[in-house]
C-alpha cells in the first residue's frame, strides 16, 4: 500500500514539474490503477463466504475423494484474481508415497461474479482418519502492490477404512471335538436345531432361508441355528514395529488382510472377535452381527504400527476369555521365539492357530527356522507377499501345515 502512494505522488510531481502532454498522459494512465489498488485495499474479505463439500465422509482405501469448494459474496466488486487453497491433511501424502502433492490450490478470474466453484479430486485415498481444517483465499491488484488473504476455519472429518479384498477361497479352520482336527470344510450347522430367525446377511445359503417368515414380513429372513460348527474366530493384529518394514507397506497389507478376513468370516456366519496388540491393546468381544464389522473397521482405519513389546505379553491376558472352539487368526509382519512359545501354549489349550505373515521378497533366515518350528507344531502358515490375497490360498500356494 505504501508503494502505491509513493508512486502516485511521484507521477503527480513529475507531471507538475515537467508539464506537457506526455507527463500528464503518464499520470492519468496510471490513475485508474492507483484507484483500483486503493479500492482493493479497502475491500473487506469478510464479504466472502466459503463452504466445503466432501462427497463421502467414509470410504475405503484407494477410492477417490471428491472435494468441492463454493465461494459466494454480496458485493459486486471486480476482483482480477482469486486464489483458493484448501489445506488438506499433510499425512495424506505421507501415508501414500505413490500419491503426488494434492492439487488443492487454484487460481481463478473472479471479476464481477458473485459465486465460484472449485473442484478437485484426491485419487487413491490412503487408509487413515483425516481432518480438513481450513481454506485460505488470496487476492490483490494486478501488480501485487496490495495482497490480501483470509483463512476460513471449516473443519470436516474423513475416515478411510482399509481396503477389503475378499479372499473367496478362505474358510477358517474346522474344529472337531477336542480342538485338534483341521480341514478346509465350509461352515456347517446342525440344520435340525433352529433356535430363531434373523434378517438375511449376504453370504447366507439359500437353504437357510425361512420362506414362510420371508413371505409374511416381505423381506428375506434366515433361520438361526443353535449349534454352529466353526463359530468363533478371533482375529489378532500385531502392531509391533518392524524395522525392516521401512515404508509401512507390509503393515498396510496386514491391516487390509485383517479387515478382509473379518468381512469374510462374518459373511459366512461366524462369530468374530478382534484383538489389536500395541502399546494399548484393544479387545472386541465375539459377535456375529453385521455391525461387528464396522466396530473393527473403525479401529483399523486409524491404527498405526507403534508396538514395542513382544505381542505375546499382551495376548496372554486374553487367552482365558477364549473357548476351546476358537480359531485364532494371527496377522503379523514378523515372528519371534516368544511367539512360538505362545502358539505352543494355545495349541495345548485346544485352540487352532492360523497365521498370516506379511513379508517382503523373501523370508529372513532367522524367521525361516521359526516358521519350520511352527509348522511342526501344526500351525497353518500363510506367507503374504503381495495384495493378491486369494493367491495365497490356492492349491499349491503359500499355505503350509504339518
Residue ranges and their predicted role:
Residues 24, 32-285, 327-331, 345, ...:
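An amphipathic, basic-hydrophobic helix/alpha-beta surface used to engage anionic
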Residues 1-43, 306-402:
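Von Willebrand factor type A / integrin I
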Residues 282-313:
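Short, charged loop segments at secondary-structure junctions
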Residues 253-256, 295, 369:
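Generic recognition of stable, solvent-exposed alpha-helical segments in well-folded globular domains
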Residues 87, 200, 299, 303, ...:
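Residues that form generic nucleotide/phosphate-binding pockets
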